Structures are given as C-alpha cells and as structure tokens.
C-alpha cells in the first residue's frame, strides 16, 4: 500500500484517514473557540474575503466542502436565498453534526451531507461555486479531490480553495515559533488536546505552497487559476474557473 504523510509522520494511506478523523472528532466541540484563539480572530477576515470573491447570487448552487461549523455555508445560504441550493458537507461526522446544529441555531435550513471530497456524490456540471476552506491539506489525494471539485462545477463556475500556505520569509522564524510552541500550548490549555494542534502545525508545513497548489489546480483542469496571499502568506485563497 502507498505511503502518505500525517503531519511529519509517514503512514499508510488508509491509516491517514483514520488519524485525521480522530483529530477532528477530538476538536469538533471546541473548533470555533480555538479558531478565534489561534488566529486572533483573523479567520473571520479570511472567510469574509472568500465570501466576497465567491459573489454568490440568488439562485446559485453552492457546494461547501469540509464545511465544518458552517461559517461559509451560512453566508452562502443567505446570499443564494430560497431559490438557491447550498450544501454543507464534511467527511467527519462530529464536525458535520456541530456545523448542522450551529446553522439551525442561526435559523439557516440547508442540507448537510457526510461527503468524501475525493468521491463527490453529485452529477457533472451541477454547482456554480465549489469551496473548501482549511480542508484540502487534510485530504490524502488532493489531486483527486480537485478533479472532483472541477467535475461537479458548471462551465463558467469556480472552484475556491482557502488554505494555510507558505508565509513570507521575514515572518518565517516568528511563525515557526508560534506554530510549534504556542499552538500546542493553546490546544493543551483550552481544549486539553496538544497533539491535535501539533498535527495542525505539521500539516500546514506539509501542504503545497502557493505556486504548487496553483499548478495542481491547473493540472486538475481548471483555468485562469490565481491566488491571493492573506496576512503575509499565512493563508492563501486560490480561485480557478471551469471553462
């Protein structure tokens, strides 16, 4: 069986899926709190930029992959309105349940679906916008997931990937210190789970950089791929169009 990485660890491909699932079962209940703490609230600005770039309009069909607690789903559902169709999906049952309950608490009624991004259960050319935020780096076969995202996107539609990326060189030393010392400490102090947040830091370092991900999206068949660096490259938003 082929090997892949789980953070800095080399594991069998089927083992990675189980390990990633374990991480997100563990962090689901504290996910929103930890996002605010770890990013000093900046994740809200990154998501707001993504929502603005998506430009979802009434009647749009939107697929939110690895949607977790539903921040993007909520905004997309409001923008698409009653004539639209917005799917809140995740491969992790715990994250999906937390997100679904959170959406319902806010009065957002939209379908939630347990979904593997490498095998998306929708027909070709179905969605106007497909998004994945902070989920691609956890996928075993990123190329397969990107190809699936393109497949279900309508001609003229867009695939959007919001993900941690490679920081600008002047920030690297401080960012490494924060990632490998502060993040696990925050995880231990506020979620009683240092290991999951150590994996977070390692998974970010193992994720392709901005230009590599751009090439991967092009190889998946997307056109006019571009990206925006946010917060000095801590995060990047990639956009590709299906022609």
Swiss-Prot record:
Its EC number is 2.1.1.163, 2.1.1.201. S-adenosyl-L-methionine binds at residues 69, 90, 116-117. InterPro entries: SAM-dependent_MTases_sf, UbiE/COQ5_MeTrFase, UbiE/COQ5_MeTrFase_CS. The keyword Aminoacyl-tRNA synthetase does not apply. Keywords: Menaquinone biosynthesis, Methyltransferase, S-adenosyl-L-methionine, Transferase, Ubiquinone biosynthesis. It comes from the Bacteria. This is Ubiquinone/menaquinone biosynthesis C-methyltransferase UbiE.
């Amino acid at each position: 069986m082929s090997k892949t990485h789980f953070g800095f660890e080399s594991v069998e491909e089927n083992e990675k899926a189980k390990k990633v699932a374990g991480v997100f079962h563990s962090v689901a209940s504290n996910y929103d709190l930890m996002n605010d703490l770890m990013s000093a609230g900046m994740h809200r600005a990154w998501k707001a930029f993504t929502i603005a770039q998506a430009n979802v309009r009434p009647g749009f069909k939107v697929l939110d992959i690895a949607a977790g607690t539903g921040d993007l789903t909520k905004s997309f559902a409001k923008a698409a309105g009653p004539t639209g169709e917005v799917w809140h999906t995740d491969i992790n049952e715990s994250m999906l349940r937390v997100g679904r309950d959170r959406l319902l608490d806010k009065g957002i009624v939209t379908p939630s679906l347990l979904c593997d991004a490498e095998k998306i259960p929708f027909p070709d050319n179905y969605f106007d916008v497909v998004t994945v935020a902070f989920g691609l780096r956890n996928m075993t076969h990123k190329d397969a997931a990107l190809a699936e995202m393109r497949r279900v996107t309508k001609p003229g539609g867009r695939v959007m990937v919001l993900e941690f990326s490679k920081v600008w060189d002047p920030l690297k030393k401080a960012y490494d210190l924060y990632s490998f010392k502060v993040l696990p400490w925050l995880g231990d102090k506020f979620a009683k789970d240092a290991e999951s947040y150590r994996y977070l830091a390692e998974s970010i370092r193992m994720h392709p950089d901005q230009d590599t991900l751009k090439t991967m999206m092009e190889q998946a068949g997307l056109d006019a791929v571009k990206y925006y660096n946010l917060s000095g490259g801590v995060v990047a938003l990639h956009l590709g169009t299906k022609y």
